[in-house]
Amino acid sequence: MTYEKHPEHQKLVRKILPRLEIGNGMDFFPIGEPNTKLGDANYKGHFVHAFNFKFKDGVSNDEIAELMNELADLKGKIPVLKELVVGKNEAHWHRGFQYGQISVFDKKEDLMTYDKHPEHQKFVRKIIPKLAGGNTMDFIPIGT
């Protein structure tokens, strides 16, 4: 049985939807290491940064793929980045967001180090002109 159709998930959806002003789904297969899974032990006790990408009309699929692969390649270049998964959005409730990124850090302050890192800044300068929008969420996982 899929997660989406599981009775417990359906029960939660029925409870949340009436209270939800707006939502955005992000389901994807990671670019790069196929065995990377959220929820693994190495995620516990960390700080998570998630970002959804919506590209402008006219940005080709090849350009998008190149940018997302470049983002995925940051994993080995920025020491504070403990985990990075990037992938194409597979959610049916995507609100136009085509790709997503989930980054994991040891602590919240490491996100600022990542944000200011020259490799990240170089990527940001390259991708910003191509984006129609983005959505970010930074959090400490529940239960850690």
Q: Which residues fall in each region the model found?
A:
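Terminal edge beta-strands and adjacent linker/stalk segments
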Residues: 16-17
